[in-house]
Amino acid sequence: MKITVIGAGHVGATAAHRIAEQQLANTVVLFDILEGIPQGKALDMYESGPVGLFDTKVYGTTDYNDTADSDIILITAGMARKPGMSREDLLMKNATIVKEVTDQVVRFSKNPIIIMVSNPLDIMTHVGYIRSKLPKERVLGMAGVLDSARFRSFIAEELNVSMRDINAFVLGGHGDSMVPVVKYTSVAGIPLTELMAQDTIEQLVDRTRKGGAEIVNYLKNGSAYYAPASSAVEMIDAIVNDRKRILPCSALLEGQYGINNVYIGAPVKLGKNGIEQILEIDLDAPELDALRKSAAIVEENCNNLASLLA
Protein backbone atom coordinates (compact mmCIF):
# COMPACT_ATOMS: atom_id res chain seq x y z
CA MET A 1 0.00 0.00 0.00
CA LYS A 2 1.35 3.38 -1.07
CA ILE A 3 -0.26 6.60 0.10
CA THR A 4 0.73 10.01 -1.20
CA VAL A 5 -0.05 13.21 0.68
CA ILE A 6 -0.01 16.34 -1.47
CA GLY A 7 0.91 19.40 0.56
CA ALA A 8 3.45 19.36 3.41
CA GLY A 9 1.75 22.07 5.43
CA HIS A 10 0.21 21.50 8.83
CA VAL A 11 -2.68 19.29 7.67
CA GLY A 12 -0.64 17.26 5.20
CA ALA A 13 2.33 16.68 7.48
CA THR A 14 0.14 15.79 10.46
CA ALA A 15 -1.87 13.35 8.32
CA ALA A 16 1.28 11.77 6.89
CA HIS A 17 2.66 11.21 10.38
CA ARG A 18 -0.58 9.62 11.59
CA ILE A 19 -0.69 7.34 8.54
CA ALA A 20 2.86 6.22 9.27
CA GLU A 21 2.24 5.74 12.99
CA GLN A 22 -0.85 3.63 12.32
CA GLN A 23 1.03 1.66 9.64
CA LEU A 24 -1.77 2.13 7.14
CA ALA A 25 0.73 1.96 4.28
CA ASN A 26 4.10 0.42 3.52
CA THR A 27 5.16 3.71 1.95
CA VAL A 28 4.05 7.28 2.58
CA VAL A 29 5.12 9.99 0.13
CA LEU A 30 4.88 13.60 1.27
CA PHE A 31 4.86 15.98 -1.71
CA ASP A 32 5.24 19.74 -1.80
CA ILE A 33 6.48 22.32 -4.30
CA LEU A 34 8.86 23.88 -1.76
CA GLU A 35 12.21 22.10 -2.01
CA GLY A 36 13.48 20.82 1.33
CA ILE A 37 10.22 21.12 3.26
CA PRO A 38 8.74 17.68 2.43
CA GLN A 39 12.14 16.01 2.60
CA GLY A 40 12.90 17.45 6.03
CA LYS A 41 9.50 16.69 7.50
CA ALA A 42 9.46 13.16 6.05
CA LEU A 43 12.90 12.40 7.48
CA ASP A 44 11.80 13.71 10.88
CA MET A 45 8.74 11.44 10.76
CA TYR A 46 10.78 8.41 9.72
CA GLU A 47 13.23 8.99 12.55
CA SER A 48 10.34 8.86 15.02
CA GLY A 49 9.69 5.25 13.97
CA PRO A 50 11.83 3.56 16.63
CA VAL A 51 9.96 5.47 19.33
CA GLY A 52 6.53 5.22 17.70
CA LEU A 53 7.19 1.56 16.87
CA PHE A 54 6.32 1.68 13.18
CA ASP A 55 8.19 0.51 10.08
CA THR A 56 6.43 2.64 7.47
CA LYS A 57 8.83 4.18 4.95
CA VAL A 58 8.29 7.94 4.68
CA TYR A 59 9.73 9.93 1.79
CA GLY A 60 9.56 13.62 0.94
CA THR A 61 9.70 14.93 -2.61
CA THR A 62 9.02 17.78 -5.01
CA ASP A 63 8.87 15.41 -8.00
CA TYR A 64 5.52 13.96 -9.06
CA ASN A 65 7.36 10.94 -10.47
CA ASP A 66 7.86 9.79 -6.88
CA THR A 67 4.09 9.59 -6.39
CA ALA A 68 3.75 6.92 -9.10
CA ASP A 69 1.44 3.97 -8.47
CA SER A 70 -0.14 5.42 -5.35
CA ASP A 71 -3.20 3.58 -4.05
CA ILE A 72 -4.59 6.58 -2.17
CA ILE A 73 -3.83 10.26 -2.74
CA LEU A 74 -4.72 12.77 -0.03
CA ILE A 75 -4.83 16.32 -1.42
CA THR A 76 -4.29 19.03 1.19
CA ALA A 77 -2.57 21.61 -1.02
CA GLY A 78 -3.87 25.15 -1.11
CA MET A 79 -3.98 28.43 0.72
CA ALA A 80 -5.15 28.43 4.33
CA ARG A 81 -7.94 30.62 5.61
CA LYS A 82 -7.17 33.85 7.40
CA PRO A 83 -9.38 35.73 9.88
CA GLY A 84 -12.49 37.07 8.20
CA MET A 85 -12.18 34.76 5.18
CA SER A 86 -14.87 32.26 4.26
CA ARG A 87 -13.98 28.96 2.65
CA GLU A 88 -15.54 30.33 -0.54
CA ASP A 89 -13.07 33.25 -0.53
CA LEU A 90 -10.41 30.68 -1.39
CA LEU A 91 -12.35 29.47 -4.42
CA MET A 92 -10.40 30.59 -7.50
CA LYS A 93 -6.91 30.37 -5.99
CA ASN A 94 -7.33 26.90 -4.60
CA ALA A 95 -9.26 25.65 -7.63
CA THR A 96 -6.26 26.50 -9.80
CA ILE A 97 -3.94 24.68 -7.39
CA VAL A 98 -6.16 21.59 -7.11
CA LYS A 99 -6.60 21.44 -10.89
CA GLU A 100 -2.82 21.39 -11.41
CA VAL A 101 -2.25 18.84 -8.65
CA THR A 102 -4.96 16.50 -9.90
CA ASP A 103 -3.71 16.69 -13.48
CA GLN A 104 -0.25 15.70 -12.30
CA VAL A 105 -1.06 12.88 -9.88
CA VAL A 106 -3.28 10.98 -12.32
CA ARG A 107 -0.45 11.01 -14.86
CA PHE A 108 1.51 8.72 -12.57
CA SER A 109 -1.20 6.79 -10.68
CA LYS A 110 -3.80 5.24 -12.95
CA ASN A 111 -6.63 4.27 -10.62
CA PRO A 112 -6.07 5.80 -7.19
CA ILE A 113 -8.64 6.82 -4.63
CA ILE A 114 -8.47 10.58 -4.17
CA ILE A 115 -9.48 12.15 -0.87
CA MET A 116 -9.82 15.92 -0.97
CA VAL A 117 -9.10 18.13 2.04
CA SER A 118 -8.43 21.46 0.31
CA ASN A 119 -11.04 24.19 0.83
CA PRO A 120 -13.68 25.05 -0.17
CA LEU A 121 -13.99 21.31 0.24
CA ASP A 122 -17.03 20.21 -1.74
CA ILE A 123 -16.11 22.44 -4.68
CA MET A 124 -12.49 21.24 -4.70
CA THR A 125 -13.73 17.64 -4.64
CA HIS A 126 -15.76 18.48 -7.75
CA VAL A 127 -12.60 19.91 -9.35
CA GLY A 128 -10.70 16.72 -8.52
CA TYR A 129 -13.46 14.55 -9.97
CA ILE A 130 -13.73 16.50 -13.23
CA ARG A 131 -9.98 16.70 -13.81
CA SER A 132 -9.09 13.15 -12.75
CA LYS A 133 -11.81 11.46 -14.83
CA LEU A 134 -11.86 8.73 -12.19
CA PRO A 135 -15.07 6.90 -11.25
CA LYS A 136 -17.16 8.93 -8.81
CA GLU A 137 -16.71 6.26 -6.14
CA ARG A 138 -12.97 6.94 -6.09
CA VAL A 139 -13.09 10.71 -5.55
CA LEU A 140 -14.44 11.92 -2.22
CA GLY A 141 -13.99 14.74 0.24
CA MET A 142 -13.20 14.96 3.93
CA ALA A 143 -15.79 17.22 5.52
CA GLY A 144 -18.54 15.51 7.46
CA VAL A 145 -16.14 13.42 9.55
CA LEU A 146 -14.48 16.63 10.75
CA ASP A 147 -17.72 18.56 11.25
CA SER A 148 -19.26 15.61 13.10
CA ALA A 149 -16.15 15.32 15.28
CA ARG A 150 -16.45 18.96 16.25
CA PHE A 151 -20.14 18.56 17.06
CA ARG A 152 -19.39 15.44 19.12
CA SER A 153 -16.59 17.15 21.03
CA PHE A 154 -18.82 20.11 21.93
CA ILE A 155 -21.56 17.75 23.15
CA ALA A 156 -19.10 15.74 25.24
CA GLU A 157 -17.73 18.93 26.78
CA GLU A 158 -21.21 20.27 27.58
CA LEU A 159 -22.42 17.02 29.16
CA ASN A 160 -19.05 16.07 30.70
CA VAL A 161 -19.15 12.58 29.20
CA SER A 162 -16.76 10.50 27.12
CA MET A 163 -16.45 11.43 23.47
CA ARG A 164 -16.57 7.71 22.70
CA ASP A 165 -20.24 7.62 23.62
CA ILE A 166 -21.30 10.41 21.25
CA ASN A 167 -22.73 9.60 17.83
CA ALA A 168 -23.57 12.45 15.46
CA PHE A 169 -24.00 13.20 11.77
CA VAL A 170 -23.26 16.50 10.07
CA LEU A 171 -24.31 16.58 6.43
CA GLY A 172 -24.30 19.17 3.66
CA GLY A 173 -21.55 21.47 2.49
CA HIS A 174 -18.39 22.02 4.50
CA GLY A 175 -19.17 25.61 5.38
CA ASP A 176 -21.69 27.81 7.13
CA SER A 177 -24.52 25.93 5.37
CA MET A 178 -23.62 22.54 6.90
CA VAL A 179 -26.51 20.57 8.40
CA PRO A 180 -25.97 18.98 11.84
CA VAL A 181 -28.73 16.35 12.06
CA VAL A 182 -29.88 16.44 15.67
CA LYS A 183 -32.42 13.61 15.28
CA TYR A 184 -29.57 11.15 14.64
CA THR A 185 -27.40 12.48 17.46
CA SER A 186 -27.20 10.37 20.59
CA VAL A 187 -25.20 9.72 23.74
CA ALA A 188 -24.73 5.99 24.41
CA GLY A 189 -27.90 5.46 22.38
CA ILE A 190 -29.90 8.10 24.26
CA PRO A 191 -31.28 10.83 21.98
CA LEU A 192 -29.51 14.12 22.57
CA THR A 193 -32.87 15.86 22.94
CA GLU A 194 -33.48 13.89 26.14
CA LEU A 195 -30.24 15.08 27.72
CA MET A 196 -29.92 18.68 26.62
CA ALA A 197 -32.20 21.69 26.36
CA GLN A 198 -33.13 22.80 22.85
CA ASP A 199 -31.49 26.22 23.21
CA THR A 200 -28.22 24.57 24.27
CA ILE A 201 -28.40 22.22 21.28
CA GLU A 202 -28.91 25.19 18.99
CA GLN A 203 -25.87 26.92 20.50
CA LEU A 204 -23.72 23.84 19.84
CA VAL A 205 -25.07 23.53 16.30
CA ASP A 206 -24.13 27.15 15.66
CA ARG A 207 -20.68 26.63 17.17
CA THR A 208 -20.19 23.60 14.93
CA ARG A 209 -20.99 25.65 11.84
CA LYS A 210 -18.42 28.23 12.95
CA GLY A 211 -15.92 25.68 14.27
CA GLY A 212 -13.27 26.29 11.63
CA ALA A 213 -13.56 30.06 11.89
CA GLU A 214 -13.25 29.89 15.68
CA ILE A 215 -9.83 28.26 15.35
CA VAL A 216 -8.75 30.60 12.54
CA ASN A 217 -9.58 33.59 14.75
CA TYR A 218 -7.44 32.18 17.56
CA LEU A 219 -4.47 31.31 15.36
CA LYS A 220 -4.55 34.59 13.36
CA ASN A 221 -2.29 33.14 10.68
CA GLY A 222 -3.42 29.64 9.80
CA SER A 223 -6.28 27.21 10.25
CA ALA A 224 -7.12 23.94 11.99
CA TYR A 225 -4.98 20.90 11.28
CA TYR A 226 -5.03 18.32 14.08
CA ALA A 227 -8.75 17.51 13.74
CA PRO A 228 -8.79 17.73 9.91
CA ALA A 229 -5.77 15.43 9.64
CA SER A 230 -7.25 12.94 12.11
CA SER A 231 -10.54 12.96 10.21
CA ALA A 232 -8.82 12.28 6.89
CA VAL A 233 -6.87 9.41 8.41
CA GLU A 234 -10.07 7.88 9.80
CA MET A 235 -11.36 7.75 6.22
CA ILE A 236 -8.08 6.26 4.99
CA ASP A 237 -8.24 3.59 7.69
CA ALA A 238 -11.77 2.64 6.57
CA ILE A 239 -10.56 2.25 2.98
CA VAL A 240 -7.26 0.48 3.63
CA ASN A 241 -8.83 -2.03 6.02
CA ASP A 242 -12.09 -2.37 4.06
CA ARG A 243 -14.03 -1.63 7.22
CA LYS A 244 -17.35 -0.72 5.57
CA ARG A 245 -17.58 2.27 7.91
CA ILE A 246 -20.63 4.53 7.69
CA LEU A 247 -19.14 8.02 7.64
CA PRO A 248 -20.34 11.41 6.39
CA CYS A 249 -18.22 12.33 3.37
CA SER A 250 -18.49 14.64 0.40
CA ALA A 251 -19.82 12.40 -2.36
CA LEU A 252 -21.33 12.93 -5.80
CA LEU A 253 -25.09 12.71 -5.40
CA GLU A 254 -27.12 11.57 -8.39
CA GLY A 255 -30.71 11.93 -7.29
CA GLN A 256 -30.32 11.14 -3.61
CA TYR A 257 -32.11 13.71 -1.43
CA GLY A 258 -33.37 15.33 -4.64
CA ILE A 259 -29.84 16.55 -5.43
CA ASN A 260 -28.23 15.89 -8.81
CA ASN A 261 -24.60 16.00 -9.95
CA VAL A 262 -23.31 17.86 -6.89
CA TYR A 263 -20.64 16.89 -4.37
CA ILE A 264 -22.12 17.34 -0.91
CA GLY A 265 -21.77 15.74 2.52
CA ALA A 266 -23.86 12.57 2.88
CA PRO A 267 -23.59 9.31 4.85
CA VAL A 268 -21.63 6.75 2.84
CA LYS A 269 -20.23 3.25 3.28
CA LEU A 270 -16.44 3.38 2.93
CA GLY A 271 -14.45 0.32 1.93
CA LYS A 272 -11.53 -0.79 -0.20
CA ASN A 273 -13.11 0.58 -3.38
CA GLY A 274 -13.88 3.98 -1.92
CA ILE A 275 -17.56 4.92 -1.70
CA GLU A 276 -19.46 1.64 -1.86
CA GLN A 277 -22.90 3.03 -1.05
CA ILE A 278 -24.58 6.37 -0.41
CA LEU A 279 -27.19 6.05 2.31
CA GLU A 280 -30.39 8.04 1.90
CA ILE A 281 -31.62 8.53 5.46
CA ASP A 282 -34.92 10.06 6.50
CA LEU A 283 -34.59 13.79 7.14
CA ASP A 284 -37.13 16.21 8.55
CA ALA A 285 -38.42 18.80 6.09
CA PRO A 286 -36.27 21.66 7.51
CA GLU A 287 -33.15 19.45 7.40
CA LEU A 288 -33.83 18.32 3.83
CA ASP A 289 -34.47 21.91 2.79
CA ALA A 290 -31.21 23.01 4.43
CA LEU A 291 -29.31 20.18 2.70
CA ARG A 292 -30.68 21.18 -0.70
CA LYS A 293 -29.87 24.84 -0.09
CA SER A 294 -26.35 23.82 0.89
CA ALA A 295 -26.04 21.84 -2.34
CA ALA A 296 -27.31 24.81 -4.34
CA ILE A 297 -24.49 26.97 -2.96
CA VAL A 298 -21.93 24.34 -3.95
CA GLU A 299 -23.47 23.96 -7.40
CA GLU A 300 -23.41 27.72 -8.03
CA ASN A 301 -19.75 27.93 -7.09
CA CYS A 302 -18.91 24.93 -9.28
CA ASN A 303 -20.66 26.57 -12.21
CA ASN A 304 -18.44 29.62 -11.71
CA LEU A 305 -15.44 27.36 -12.33
CA ALA A 306 -16.70 25.92 -15.62
CA SER A 307 -14.24 27.86 -17.77
CA LEU A 308 -11.30 26.89 -15.53
CA LEU A 309 -12.17 23.20 -15.73
CA ALA A 310 -12.89 23.09 -19.47
From Swiss-Prot:
Q: Where does NAD(+) bind?
A: G7, A8, G9, H10, V11, G12, D32, N94, V117, S118, N119
Instruction: Give this protein's Gene Ontology molecular function annotations.
Output: L-lactate dehydrogenase activity; L-malate dehydrogenase (NAD+) activity
List residues binding substrate.
R81, R87, N119, R150
Q: Which reaction does it catalyse?
A: (S)-malate + NAD(+) = oxaloacetate + NADH + H(+)
Q: Which SUPFAM superfamilies match?
A: LDH C-terminal domain-like (SSF56327), NAD(P)-binding Rossmann-fold domains (SSF51735)
The UniProt record lists the EC number as 1.1.1.37
Question: Which InterPro entries does the record match to this protein?
Answer: L-lactate/malate_DH (IPR001557), Lactate/malate_DH_C (IPR022383), Lactate/malate_DH_N (IPR001236), Lactate_DH/Glyco_Ohase_4_C (IPR015955), Malate_DH_type3 (IPR011275), NAD(P)-bd_dom_sf (IPR036291)
A Pfam family hit: Ldh_1_N
**Keywords of this protein's UniProt record, alphabetized?**
NAD, Oxidoreductase, Tricarboxylic acid cycle
GO BP annotations of the record are: lactate metabolic process; tricarboxylic acid cycle
What positions constitute the catalytic site?
Answer: H174 (proton acceptor)
Annotated signal sequence is: none
* The protein's role, per its UniProt record: Catalyzes the reversible oxidation of malate to oxaloacetate.
Family, similarity comment:
Belongs to the LDH/MDH superfamily. MDH type 3 family.
User: What is the protein name given in its UniProt record?
Assistant: Malate dehydrogenase
Q: Which organism is it from?
A: Chlorobium phaeobacteroides (strain BS1)
